[in-house]
Amino acid sequence: MEVKERYKKNIGTITEAEQESLKTKKVFVAGLGGLGGYICEMLARMGVGHIKAIDCDVFEESNLNRQIFSTEKSLGRAKTEMAKKRLKEINSSISLDIKNERLEEINSRELINGCDIIIDALDSIDTRLILASAAKDMNIKMVHGAICGWYGQVSVIFPEDNTLKRIYGDKKGKGQEKSIGNPPFTPALVASLEVAEAVKILIGRESSLRNKILLIDTLLQDYEVVDI
């Protein structure tokens, strides 16, 4: 099996057969902001064959500090437009299905249908719970990630799990990032960890974070895995 030159630095971390299998996988990314941009870029560089993603926002100046698809020239343009452009420049061989659409209860199941895994890059607890419910109904595994300030968290959710309810309980609305901000390093770090977990699942390896949550504190550089 001949691995393309562009993927050879993946080999050793994963096998040639695992690299080949990634070409057949389809990943749904919910959101193209701070987390979602990094997630999609890493999936494209890793060689995942099919990336489906949604977002309904345009780039604003406040995105420039942390969102990898945002540039001064992209301000006012749709995040989906810039995502397509950058991902095709990175890897023209992959299939992209990127839509300017909002995730809601009414469309959630249709959006994720046919995907092998879902990666959460949302900033709304309500929308995360909608996504998790749809994933459960469609029997699709999901990687959860969230960020705020110096802090982040990552967890892996199988269809039979009730992880987000355990994490958030009855909380609603936006996450804490609206009040304490987001520097560039937390989305990059949490996105990397989400993609690592997603890739493990896609190639048939065991997840490290099912029924657990990785709590990240970059201020104190403290990383703790907690059972949930």
Regions found by a protein language model. Give the residues of each.
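A structured beta-alpha segment of the ubiquitous adenosine-cofactor-binding alpha/beta core
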Residues: A78-I117, L122-R128
